[in-house]
From Swiss-Prot:
UniProt-annotated binding residues for Mg(2+): D382, D384
Record's protein name: Copal-8-ol diphosphate hydratase, chloroplastic
Family: Belongs to the terpene synthase family.
Primary localization: plastid
Annotated function: Class-II terpene synthase that synthesizes 8-hydroxy-copalyl diphosphate. Involved in the biosynthesis of cis-abienol, a labdane diterpene that can be used as synthesis precursor of ambergris substitution fragance products.
Transit peptide: 1-24
Co-factor requirement: Mg(2+)
Expression tissues: Expressed specifically in the secretory cells of the glandular trichomes.
């Protein structure tokens, strides 16, 4: 099947309509199509994350967003069948993760498919060592690759996705190669026929999908073809526009700049005219002998100069490409994008060791001043690779500065390369994501966030999401999600659910001088593993939800005004953040702690509860034995103590059984400290956050001793977390929006990000820091989304398989 690129634009919210409900799918689409991208509570323009937004999309019909009421009842009917399926999933997942690990460990210089365009240019090089007049190509394997890889319609290029720029450029250069070496004329003639029949399609080709430098290199090849008397309609009207574009682009390229400063023009030297000063240009070679890792540009340079370094590079490329040619090396971009895809698909936790090696490689070639390019040791950098490196390195604990982004600031705008005219949605999307991993005082990231937010909003508003660097399944959907749920409010399992539907797998394709594929980044193995893992985790979550409901009934929490909906939300927030099957204990500890806290605060807030009553409960809690009934009745105080004690005892026993660590005393101290705050009517709501974190970390075995509580970094984390969550809780409960207080939350979040991800000499386990951040994100998320959207996410994350 061949995919034709057209101007039709997919509706960017299609991934929201998959929910099964009484509302028909078509009705759901019609409903969503009324509304553009929106934030439910806050607009994220600039540094003010909390500007109020007028909603134009409220709905009274919760069913199409996800009616969670149907999930509030227990259902054990499929437990046995689900267990067998779960075993099968685990076995399959093991095989897929091993396959992915092999891919990551064997990435080396980055895998790309062989490119007809570069292969043909390398095949142009004559073997000057031949005696006599019988000239032959220096790289006969490249010529043979061209002969062996013509498509059935007579063209060369990407087979599945039909892009007219790609097909015409590849076909023309291969026709020239066959003509130059006077071989396989029937294939050449078939290629010429394809060009004649399809040249007019340039009139309707999407400019956004024009291959890089097409307006430079295509006219050059036409001139070369004309010199070889290849029968092509050189006076076709559509070619006049291409030549005009070439002249415009050449006027924007100062010749002196080309010869003195490394620029992206080095990538397309074969498209320039003959008045080049090679003595000066050779000084701009990369250490590997290439001109910006382009075999075509380097082949052209070699034919003009006979430079030995150019030849060495080309020989290496052909050897690495099994007789053809491709851009080489591509080691940095493949590593970064593979990590990014696996993270967003929600399966990165399987590959922690592999990620460490991949990022060590990237960091080895990180240039603090200039940033990086697709391949190592480049003398040119771009914003896309640079911002992706900053974000991923920073999130994994590497000490990197964002100052290199100043190279891509042009006035009040940001560009991918110096001198770029038109911005790209995907590059600004990646820069926007990078800008949110912001430390206090980093002005360049603040400016990048402001610019990219507005840029991406305009892309969606004007249906201008076609990208000049990649053809992907759902770029509008990716942008919509990033704007709708900024990083602070994006829960891992929610993001994974969306991205599994947005990721095109092996169907996604990249745009350079021609179309190309990066199997290390885009493949169906990643997608298959992500879907399998998602359903595997979800099955565990549904089982735990049954446990939560039974526990809820047994403990009689409804006496304290706690609803099953609150129970479901509590479990969802935990499961959407700590989702791994193996982390059931931490997940349940999180969810149950919220319910226990709610029970105690509800009891304390009762008008009949006095300071004396609070103190009595605290004193009873300090006693090791269970409370006794008074006059044979189980009072509320007794029920509170019983539920609390049983929860802590069970958690302690499970942790000891699984990890061999006795956390009972530490748990007792943590909850006792919180009860003291509650007794004194202090702001225990803030302290509740730190209690959640301590309980989760203790259950995970991350806190081995109490001394860490007095560590300065831990105290800073704890205080800042309590402060931020207190403000977010106030926003959620009191519907406070706007004002300086809200700006301060943004500043506090930046400080928290630095404490969690900054490369400090802290004694605190990174898992402990990550728990702080995960809990804070759930508070941010809860303040950020509407009840309808949360219902929808609950349905998608916990109950609907992918």
């Amino acid at each position: 099947m061949q995919v034709i690129i057209t101007s039709s634009h997919r509706f960017f919210c299609h991934h929201l309509h998959q929910l099964k409900s009484p509302t028909s799918l078509s009705a759901q689409k019609a409903e969503f199509k009324k509304h553009g991208p929106r934030n439910w509570l806050f607009q994220t323009e600039g540094s003010l994350l909390y500007k109020p937004v007028r909603l134009n999309c409220a709905t009274s019909d919760a069913s199409y967003l996800g009616n969670v009421n149907e999930y509030l009842e227990s259902d054990h009917s499929k437990n046995s069948e689900e267990k067998d399926i779960q075993v099968s999933r685990t076995i399959q997942m093991k095989g897929l993760t091993e396959e992915i690990k092999h891919m990551l460990n064997s990435m080396e210089d980055g895998r790309l498919n062989v490119l007809a365009y570069d292969t043909a240019w390398v095949s142009f090089i004559p073997n000057t060592t031949n005696n006599g007049n019988d000239q032959r190509p220096m790289f006969p394997s490249c010529l043979q690759w061209i002969i062996d890889n013509q498509l059935s319609d007579g063209s060369w290029g990407e087979e599945i996705v039909f892009c007219i720029y790609d097909r015409l450029l590849n076909t023309l250069v291969c026709v020239i190669a066959l003509t130059l070496w006077n071989t396989c004329l029937h294939k050449r003639n078939k290629g010429v026929m394809f060009i004649k029949e399809n040249l007019s399609k340039l009139e309707t080709g999407e400019v956004e999908n024009m291959t890089s430098g097409f307006e430079l290199v295509f006219p050059t090849l036409l001139e070369k073809a004309q010199q070889l008397d290849i029968d092509i309609p050189y006076d076709a009207p559509v070619l006049k526009d291409i030549y005009a574009r070439r002249e415009v682009k050449l006027t924007r390229i100062p010749k002196d700049v080309i010869h003195t400063i490394p620029t992206t023009v080095l990538f397309s030297l074969e498209g320039l005219r003959d008045d080049l000063d090679w003595q000066r240009l050779l000084k701009l070679q990369m250490p590997d002998g290439s001109f910006l890792i382009s075999p075509a540009s380097t082949a052209f340079a070699f034919m003009e100069t006979n430079d030995e370094k150019c030849l060495a590079y080309l020989q290496n490329v052909v050897e690495k490409s099994n007789g053809g040619a491709r851009q080489y090396p591509f080691d940095l971009v493949t590593r970064l994008w593979a990590i990014d895809r696996l993270q967003r698909l929600g399966i990165s936790y399987y590959f922690a060791e592999e990620f460490k090696e991949l990022l060590n490689h990237v960091f080895r070639y990180w240039d603090e001043e200039n940033g990086i390019f697709s391949g190592r040791n480049s003398n040119v950098s771009d914003v896309d690779d640079t911002c992706m490196a900053i974000r991923l390195l920073r999130l994994h604990g590497y000490d990197v500065s964002p100052d290199a982004l100043n190279n891509f600031k042009d006035g009040d705008q940001f560009v991918c390369f110096r001198g770029e005219v038109d911005g790209s949605p995907t590059h600004m999307f990646n820069l926007y994501r990078c800008s949110q991993v912001l430390f206090p005082g980093e002005k360049i990231l603040e400016e990048a966030k402001n610019f990219t937010y507005n840029f991406l909003q305009q892309c969606l508003a004007n249906n201008r999401c076609l990208d000049k660097w990649v053809i992907a399944k759902d770029i509008p959907g990716e942008i919509w999600y990033a704007l709708e749920f900024p990083w602070y409010a994006s829960l891992p399992r929610v993001e994974a659910r969306y991205y599994i539907e947005q990721y095109g797998g092996a169907d996604d394709i990249w745009i350079g001088k021609t179309l190309y594929r990066m199997p290390d980044v885009n493949n169906n193995v990643y997608l298959q593993a992500a879907k399998l893992d998602y359903n595997r985790c979800q099955s565990q979550h549904r089982f735990e939800w049954l446990i939560m409901q039974e526990w809820f009934e047994k403990c009689n929490f409804q006496q304290f005004g706690i609803s099953k909906k609150y129970l479901l939300v509590s479990y969802f927030l935990a499961a959407a953040s700590i989702f791994e099957v193996e982390k059931s204990r931490e997940r349940l500890a999180w969810a149950k702690s919220r319910i226990i806290c709610k029970m105690i605060t509800s009891y304390y807030n009762d008008e009949a509860t006095t300071w004396t009553t609070r103190n009595s409960l605290l004193m009873e809690f300090k006693v090791s034995h269970d409370p006794t009934r008074k006059n044979g009745n189980e009072t509320k105080e007794i029920l509170v103590l019983k539920n609390l004690r049983q929860f802590l005892r069970q958690l302690s026993e499970e942790t000891f059984e699984d990890l061999g660590k006795d956390i009972h005393h530490q748990l007792q101290n943590a909850w006792e400290t919180w009860l003291v705050f509650l007794r004194e009517e202090k702001n225990a709501c803030q302290e509740e956050t730190e209690l959640l974190v301590r309980t989760i970390n203790l259950s995970g075995g991350y806190m081995t001793h109490d001394e860490i509580l007095f560590d300065a970094d831990y105290e800073n984390l704890s205080n800042l977390t309590n402060k931020v969550c207190g403000k977010l809780n106030e926003l959620q409960n009191d519907k406070v929006t706007g004002g300086s207080k809200n700006t301060n939350i943004e500043l506090d979040m930046q400080a928290l990000v630095k404490l969690v991800f900054g490369n400090t000499s802290s004694n605190i386990n990174q898992d402990i820091k990550q728990t702080f951040f995960a809990v804070v994100k759930t508070f941010y998320y809860s303040a950020h989304v509407s009840e309808e959207i949360m219902n929808f996410h609950i349905s998608k994350v916990l109950f609907q398989q992918v």
